[in-house]
Amino acid sequence: MVASECEPYAKTGGLADVVDALARALGQLGHEADVYLPRYRGLEPPAGSVRQPMTIPLPSGPGDDTPSRPTEMVLWDCPGDGYRLRLVDHPPSFDRAGLYGQDGSDYPDNGARFALLGHVALAAAAADGVPLDVLHGHDWQAGPALMAMAHGPRRKVALRQTVTILTCHNLAFHGWVPPQHAWQLGLPARSAGAGGVDLLREGIGAADMVNTVSPTYAVESLTAEYGGGVDADLRARGKRYRGILNGIDDSLWDPATDEALPATYDSRDLSGKEVDRLDLAARHGLDAAGPIFGMVGRLDPQKGFDLVAAAAQELLAMGGRLIVLGTGDARLLEELRTVARPNPDRVALLDRFDRDEARRIYAGADIFLMPSRFEPSGQGQLIALRYGTVPLVRRTGGLADTIRDVDAPRSEGTVAGNGYVFEHATPEALLSTAQRALTGWTDRERWLALVRRGMAEDHSWSGPARLYEQLYRDARRLRSESSRASAERSEVVAGS
C-alpha cells in the first residue's frame, strides 16, 4: 500500500485509521502487506527497524532532455502490527511543520513530494525480487505511484504482473500540481494543462480498478453534485469502479475494555453506560434529566455542523442536551458558542481535539449526531453503534449504507432499524427526526432494545477485507481479459 497517513504514525483524519486497519485485516487473512509512508517530522522508526540507504533518479528540471538527478534517501523497514511499515526518509521533502501544508496553504511541491514516495515504493518493491501482486494506493497522494506503474516500470520482473488499485476516500481532495511544478513528477500526465496536474484524476485513469469507501457514495459520486469534478472519469471506469464500506477496528473500539471510560460495559450489562452518561454530564455541567446528543468531528458544513447550530436552540427547547467536540470553521464555532453561553447546563462546547474525550462522548451520549451533507463512509456512526449510542444521521454515503431508520415500515425479512435517519439537509428535517428520537428515548424498554441491537452488529474489518480480496481478484481477471483481447487484436492486424 502507498499512503500519506497511517495510524498511529501519521494522522489528520480517517484515512489513517483505514490504512492501518485494512493492512492488519489483510494480514490476518494470510496476505503479506507493506505500507509505504513518508517519515514526517517527529516520526521515529520503531525499535527493531532496519535502515536501508537508497538512491533514486529524479528530474532535475523541465524538459525531456534534462538529465535526471540522483537523490539519496533512506528507507526504514519497520515491524508493524500485522504488516511491514516502510518509512521513506527524505528530510527535504517530509521534515516539515505539516503533512500537506501549513498556515492554511498546501505546499507547492506536494506533487514532487508524493511522486518521491511513489517512486521509492516501486523501486523498493522491485528490489525485493518477489513478485508484487497488488499495488494499492490511497487518495491523490498515491496518484504518482499509479501513474508510474502505467508508464513503464513493468519491465522490472517483480512488477510485471502487478495489478493496481486506487481507493478514493474523499473526492473533495484532488492534489493539484501547479503547471510550473508539473515537471517535478517526472511522469507524463493526461490532465496536464494551464491549470496544472490533477493527481486524483491521474490516479483514477491509471489504476486497474478504482473504489470508494461505501456503495452509496460510489453511486452518488457518478453525479456532478457529489463527484468532486471527476464524476465523468469515474463513469468512464464502468465495471472497474465500485464501493466497499469501511469497517472499524473492534479491538480498539470496545466499551467492555476501553480504558478512557469511567466504567466499562457490554450489551448484557448496560449499567456502566449509565455511569458514563452521568459522569459526562457532571464533568461538563450538563443537566442529565434529558437525553444527551453528542457530536464529534471537524467543524465544517460538510459534516452538518451548520444544521446543528441552526437547530440547537429548538433542540434544547424540546428537552435535549448537546455536547460538541471538535475544531474547525471559526464562524460555526461562534454560532455554537452563541447557543452555549446562555445555556451552560444544556450545552457543552469543547473546542479541541481530544481522543479520550471523544471516547467518553461515544459512551456517555444517548444519541450521536451525524447530519452530514455528504459522507463517503463515516466512522462515527459505527463507533456509536458499538458503544450503544443511537445514531441520528442524514441519508447519504456510508451513513445510508449502515443506519436504518427504526420507524421506517419494514417488509418481511428486512432487518430492524438501528437509528434515526432524515433525508434533506435542512434544520427542519434534523429537528423533526430529533423529535422522533426524543420520543423514542422516553420508551425505555424499546430504547434499550434499540441500543442492544446496534451493539450486536458486526462492523469489523473482517468483512471489508474479504471484499478487497475480491477486488484484487477482479482486477487481475480484468487485466487478463484485457491482455487477451489486445493480443487477439494484434493477431488480426498482423494477419490482415
Language model: regions and residue ranges:
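Catalytic cores of nucleotide-sugar-dependent glycosyltransferases that transfer UDP/GDP/TDP-activated
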Residues: 1-496
